[in-house]
Amino acid sequence: MSGVRIPLFPRFIPHGTVKLESAALKKLNSLELSGGYAVAVSGGVDSITLLNLVAALHKTQATSRPVVLTGNHGFRAEADHETRFVQKRAVALGLDCEILRWNRHRTSSKSQETAREIRYSLLHQWCTEHSVKFLLTAHNKSDQAETVLMHLERGSGIDGLSGMHERSVFGDITIYRPLLGFTRQEILEYATQKQLSWVEDPSNQDPKYRRTFFRNLIAESKNPGVVVDRLCRTTSHMHRALACILHYVRSSLDYCLEFSPLGFITVKSQELRSVPEEIASRLLLLSLMAMGGKDHKPRYSAFWPILTKILQGQDFTPRTLHGCKVRKEPDGNFSIVRELARIETKIGVKTIAETIQWDRRFAIKIMCTHNASAAETTSCSAKHAPNPSEETQNLYITPLGNGSLPEHLVHVNRDVACSLPVLAHGDKVLAYPWQNHNIGVSPTISVEEVLVRRGVINLICHQLYR
């Protein structure tokens, strides 16, 4: 059973408590949190400490108002009590609090990893819906050490061993971890001296979880503090090495890859074979992630055979991986094309002249034709304004698909052409991109920007700050 822990009143306030509060408030004060931010609070001692520090900061700096978020994934009966406890504590400190509940399909897995995924999904959804760009979490130095050991057990490379960072990116949300420089013991001492109350989660003591196993392993060592310090020092070394590798990945980008205005990537095989294997591997990984619209890497077991064949110049039949189709071209290079079956079939158009991000590959604009008069353009815009008619509601962007190709696309690789966007109304295609239109005031579709190259560069940055 979980329960609220209320420490006895302390006889004195040690120097370490004052130091933690001063350093943490200085860290919080240095963060760029314009426009408001959210604070993830589970009710444990770490997050309650963060909540207390944020409330103290808000009293002196009321420019950015925080919102406390606490999640209930429904795995434990005590979760309702814990979320209400957090809400009551937040309100007592003068802060707004939202309880986030997982109301989607139930999962058979109730592991800590599944709970974490659900929690982050809830947090990201709320932040996105409320246009909140910054999220604070209470990860600490001890969490970092345990994470490194867990990744080491899984055989992680430099990415995994570089651990968590004080600033990272999750989708379009920036996550800050202001307590990452303090151990769990330092935070516990602070909370005790400050007479804070918190919730004890029994799963944190359950040895069936690997994190608990490694937590106990560190605690049973001769000098736990030294072990934590050295493991965290390892993450710093690995992060520097990762930054170095990603620097060379970025500098090799245009040498090894060619980005087509038709929204696919050509891997220049000879150039790829001339760079170190680690650089080549990451370039191919990033290409698959960007083209497939993914933020995570493909399975190693499926990815490695493709990389090996490319580096060795071997032939292979076209194959799909990570939402992409990879094929060898007659010139010996390889193309990475979006897999048609993985593209969302319909994206509705609400207004004329809006720019839409489509399939994370194209920025698309819907316009009236350039040869329409001003009066016609006004009429067209009004026709497709907000609160649209039934006709406008049926206007959407969709991939061209496996039907017949228009004349201006017959010279294009069929896989590429089929994955291109078209403007449709009902079951009829109204317009294709890269085509001259002369059809009065009918809306047209144009590609404002191809986003694939930018997507690869963003992924490089996110790997450094994840």
UniProtKB/Swiss-Prot annotation:
Catalytic reaction(s) noted: cytidine(34) in tRNA(Ile2) + L-lysine + ATP = lysidine(34) in tRNA(Ile2) + AMP + diphosphate + H(+)
GO cellular component, as recorded: cytoplasm
Pfam families named in the record: ATP_bind_3
UniProt keyword terms in alphabetical order: ATP-binding, Cytoplasm, Ligase, Nucleotide-binding, tRNA processing
GO molecular function, one term: tRNA(Ile)-lysidine synthase activity
Residues that hold ATP according to the record: 42-47
Gene3D superfamilies: HUPs
Disulfide links within the chain: none
CDD domains in alphabetical order: TilS_N (cd01992)
The keyword RNA-binding appears for this protein: no
Cell compartments where the protein resides: Cytoplasm
Notes concerning its domains: The N-terminal region contains the highly conserved SGGXDS motif, predicted to be a P-loop motif involved in ATP binding.
Protein family membership: Belongs to the tRNA(Ile)-lysidine synthase family.
UniProt cross-references to HAMAP family, sorted A to Z: tRNA_Ile_lys_synt (MF_01161)
Protein name as annotated: tRNA(Ile)-lysidine synthase
